[in-house]
Regions:
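A short glycine-/small-residue-rich loop at the edge of a beta-strand within enzyme catalytic domains
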Residues: 106-110, 132-135, 139, 172-173, ...
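Polybasic low-complexity intrinsically disordered regions
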Residues: 1-153, 159-161
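Short amphipathic alpha-helical "interface-anchor" segments enriched in bulky aromatics
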Residues: 170-197, 232-270
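Generic recognition of cysteine residues
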Residues: 64, 94, 131, 156, ...
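Mature extracytoplasmic/luminal segments of secretory-pathway proteins
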Residues: 61, 153, 175, 190, ...
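Short gly/pro/ser/thr-enriched loop/turn and capping motifs at secondary-structure boundaries
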Residues: 162-167
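Long, low-complexity, polar/charged, intrinsically disordered or flexibly structured peripheral segments
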Residues: 200-241
Length: 270
């Protein structure tokens, strides 16, 4: 069946649902699911040693390609499996759980390489301006953060893939530790000389009874808000400037489960 016809039908349905207020692009999530080719080389009961050799193209499907399906993108699990086939990339409205756009590629195509094409194609008929884009760490690529911000004034909620980070020690993970060994609290941001700085304050500054463990002079200055203050410059890199430990990040990222639910329903349809 002609894929263009199916795509037009889906586009018409999305526009109708949007008009009815059922589909929205405020929170959109992208994920892919493997689609195995109908070939004996994908049979788990087959013990041929060369069935996943790149040059051993299945005769039953000359278009499929060799891909790798990881067990999870949520953790650092090493479990994965090879397969011959395709990938179905689906952009989902994470509020209604309904699909907005679909693209099928061969299995070797990396998820992140088609993300911007999918967003652009969606935006051409259903605007995604001011969206919050949710994806797993397979999409943790600097260009995606920048393009979502620049083209759509959007925001990315994507976990950090440490394999893409040259120096994890420079990341804004955790709060600075004061001289007393306590984790300091965030106390707002401000811009200064073209840079954004995060302010941190003493966690005991408002306490009336607690004493500073190291008896720091700043804690006994007689002021209402006492204790030490520190400032850290937030990186200009959008990817590294996200506080992934914040409630804001975690609550928004939890909406991405709608992508997994959709993929589960897709697989159950056969």
């Amino acid at each position: 069946f002609d894929n263009k016809i199916l795509s037009e039908i889906m586009k018409t349905q999305v526009l109708f649902l949007s008009k009815e207020g059922i589909v929205d692009t405020s929170f959109i999530g992208l994920d892919s699911t493997p689609v195995s080719a109908n070939t004996s080389q994908n049979n788990p009961k087959s013990f041929l040693s060369n069935k996943f050799k790149p040059g051993n193209q299945p005769r039953a499907d000359s278009d499929c390609r060799l891909g790798v399906h990881t067990a999870s993108n949520q953790t650092n699990e090493k479990k994965y499996e090879f397969y011959w086939g395709y990938k179905n990339h689906v952009l989902v409205d994470c509020i209604s759980g309904l699909p907005i756009y679909e693209m099928t590629t061969t299995a070797e195509v990396h998820d992140a390489t088609v993300a911007l094409d999918i967003l652009a194609a969606t935006h051409s008929f259903q605007p995604i301006t001011d969206c919050i884009f949710l994806a797993d760490k397979g999409y943790d690529v600097k260009n995606i953060y920048n393009q979502v911000k620049e083209l759509y004034n959007g925001e990315c909620i994507i976990p950090l893939n440490k394999r893409n980070t040259k120096n994890p020690k420079l990341l804004p993970q955790g709060n600075p530790i004061c001289e007393a060994g306590l984790a300091m609290w965030k106390d707002g941001k401000f811009s200064d000389c073209g840079r954004t700085r995060q302010k941190f304050c003493c966690p005991l500054k408002s306490s009336k009874d607690t004493l500073c463990p190291c008896h720091h002079k700043n804690f006994y200055n007689g002021k209402k808000h006492r204790g030490c203050t520190r400032y850290l410059t937030i990186p200009d890199d959008l990817r590294l400037s996200i506080d992934r430990d914040s409630k804001y990040f975690k609550s928004n990222y939890s909406l991405r489960t709608e992508c997994e639910r959709y993929n589960s329903r897709f697989k159950n349809t056969g």
